[in-house]
Amino acid sequence: MPQTWLIVGATRGIGLEFTSQLLSLGHTVIATARSPTHSLLTPSPSLPLPLPNQTPNPDPHSPRTPKFPSNASNLWALTGTPNGHNLTILECDVSDEKSIKSFTESVRKLGRKGGVLEGGVIDVVVLNAGVLEYPGRVSEISFTSFAHHLHTNTIGPLITASHLLSLSSPLLPPSSSSSTSSSTQPTTPLSPLQPTIPIQIKTMVFTSSDSGSTTNFRSFEDGFGAYAASKAALNQGLRHLAAEIHRKSRSKAPSTSASISNLITNPNLQPNSAESGNDKTVVLALHPGEVSTDMANVALDWEVEGIISPQESISCMLKVIREKGYGGQDEGGVVSARSEGKREEEGAATFWTWEGKRYPW
């Protein structure tokens, strides 16, 4: 069955291959491109980025026209493939909080009637944006370079995830009364461009790395200090995020009668959406393997074994996500843990390799 995926960081390497394979399988894909300020002016959040050499519909509130980002040419090329009509491209720079907020509102607006998210569900979000500046030895690295690793590989993906998860709350019209204002002016009605239903995320995937494992410390990875530290911090952050999601979903689950009432009063609400009482999100961390990408194309001081292509990595990871993600036969790794005589904590994030093997935190 066709699904809706959101790939954050899709202009090259793993993210681009995710987008390509998902489109070929007939899925709907929302993909993001990060653009330097000097090559892309910020568009209206309600407008997707334009196709190459195409002038978008002008934003009546802004005279500025977004330009085609040259660093995303391979991503834009996918719009010309047989299923390219299923691709929506938005702007997001995970190292910039304003960009993250603008991107989140762009996603929210895709939930309005006629938008690709009008069903109120994103089946899978893949937070893939990342950076590797080599060498990144802790004993030699600059403050700026270390901070860049943390902002791009850790803080950005987690904050982006947090903002996207906030979409599970419906956007309500302004309150009809306010204790802080004596104005008698009527309340501004909800804009028809704003969605009235929440958007549920079923599975959230973070692209992690074996370098971030604190159990299997890889001391031979000279020059990976900053990168490894950023991935280790990402792992801890996403584990806490999963625990927080689980606690919140348990504390606010409405009664069955309340859920039925909501569905009756809002027929557009999906039965498995957050508002109907099932806002569980499965959180996964994935090590994609030693993938031959532009980011990994650096001269290392050690031999990397088992290098695989992006095509192989993504093909395998799609299988892992299908099995371990929301509704999978091994959702959250519960079944595989039981087979090993272990108990998987409910709602916990789990860490997997592209081969579907459990990896230690």
Regions found by a protein language model. Name each.
Residues 8, 118-130, 153, 205-208, ...:
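Rossmann-fold scaffold of SDR-type NAD(P)-dependent oxidoreductases
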Residues 79-98:
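Rossmann-fold cofactor-recognition segment
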Residues 94-120:
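Conserved Rossmann-fold cofactor-binding substructure of NAD(P)-dependent oxidoreductases
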Residues 130-131, 137-150, 155, 166-176, ...:
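Catalytic loop of short-chain dehydrogenase/reductase
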Residues 272-273, 277-280, 285-286, 291-293, ...:
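C-terminal helical subdomain
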